[in-house]
Design a protein with these regions (language model features):
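Alpha-helical transmembrane segments of multi-pass membrane transporters/permeases
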Residues: 1, 57, 102, 115-141, ...
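Signature of the first transmembrane helix
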Residues: 1-42, 136, 193-216
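Alpha-helical transmembrane segments of multi-pass membrane transport and lipid-handling proteins
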Residues: 2, 37, 64-99, 165, ...
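Alpha-helical transmembrane segments of multi-pass membrane transporters
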Residues: 2-9, 80-81, 126-149, 162, ...
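Helix-loop junctions and terminal segments of transmembrane helices
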Residues: 9, 38-54, 228, 232-270, ...
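Membrane-interface helix-capping segments at transmembrane helix termini in multi-pass transporters
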Residues: 15-26, 52-65, 75-105, 145-153, ...
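C-terminal transmembrane helix end/exit motif
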Residues: 45, 111-122, 137, 141-144, ...
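Interhelical loop/hinge segments that connect adjacent transmembrane helices in multipass membrane
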Residues: 122-125, 149-156, 165-206, 245, ...
Length: 295
């Protein structure tokens, strides 16, 4: 969550609003392709693993059958993104956009949902801290001027891919390999599609706004908007982290029909979200004038 506070002022001064805007625009387009590659897997996979986490055989079958669709959908998304690069991408953005294909590829390797479903948060948090720290150091070391935009894009994309690959080294501790079975795998598609609808709705205002800014205005405007949104996302990340933690816990309790605990956790979560979001909103408003010059 604090990465933008450390990195954004430096990147803004080295790459300028133009460079930040190009990164924001190209990343948003690649991110929408990656979103299709996941097709609701983050939420559905998290919930499915949590419901059967006490049975190693069942959770192994669930994991490999869900990941099978993740591969198929990611390959489809990469094909669509390749068509965008060939026929629709502006020549001036093609180099950066080509590097961003790693962002789409990341959706194939992303198995955070499996560890979240098992409530193994320590592993993912430790991985994030180490990889993000290396990414920050790499940016400071290799990004020195505006022409280094492609290096910045490569570092950010590779850091995510490396983080996902690190998690794969731990899969054997929690899962046994099971060949995906069509009869079992096909039942996931309708449920994935249902969960994909709200994800698409959220992505409309999270990603399309930057794409529209870059298309209808100059890239500098997209760059200014990107930095503002990064600051807003810092406190918002604390709120969304609660959902990431509570989803597997609630799914597990539902599978065990622990109604009392479900109601208790729901009430406490709502109280936390309302009070903390109000405090953070007023806090941002209070320091906005002092923060703006740095970003």
């Amino acid at each position: 969550f604090i990465l933008p506070l450390v990195l954004s002022p430096y990147v803004s001064r080295v790459l300028g609003a133009q460079g930040v805007g190009v990164y924001s625009y190209t990343y948003s387009i690649a991110g929408m392709a990656a979103l299709f590659g996941m097709l609701g897997v983050n939420h559905y996979g998290n919930r499915s693993i949590a419901a059967v986490r006490d049975d190693r055989e069942k959770r192994s079958r669930e994991f490999w059958n869900i990941w099978f669709w993740q591969i198929v959908l990611t390959m489809t998304a990469m094909s669509g993104y390749a068509c965008y690069l060939r026929f629709f991408c502006s020549p001036g953005l093609r180099r950066v956009s080509a590097i961003q294909i790693l962002t789409v590829l990341n959706s194939m390797a992303d198995i955070n949902w499996m560890f979240f479903g098992l409530e193994e948060f320590r592993l993912t948090v430790t991985r994030n801290v180490v990889i993000k720290g290396l990414a920050v150091l790499s940016v400071f070391a290799f990004v020195k001027e505006q022409q280094d935009l492609w290096i910045y894009v490569l570092i950010m994309a590779c850091s995510v891919l490396l983080g996902n690959l690190v998690l794969w080294t731990q899969v054997g501790k929690y899962m046994d390999f099971r060949r995906p079975e069509w009869t079992r795998a096909k039942k996931h598609i309708p449920k994935l599609a249902v969960l994909f609808v709200p994800v698409v709705a959220v992505s409309v205002y999270q990603r399309m706004d930057k794409v529209m800014l870059g298309s209808l205005s100059v890239m500098e405007q997209s760059g200014y908007y990107e930095n503002v949104e990064k600051i807003i996302n810092i406190p918002k990340g604390v709120i969304t982290a609660l959902g990431t933690v509570m989803l597997p816990r609630m799914s597990y309790l539902i599978s065990r029909e622990e109604t009392g605990l479900i109601e208790q956790y729901t009430a406490r979560s709502m109280e936390f979200v309302m009070f903390s979001s109000s405090a953070m909103a007023f806090g941002i408003a209070a320091v906005a004038n002092d923060f703006a010059p740095f970003f």
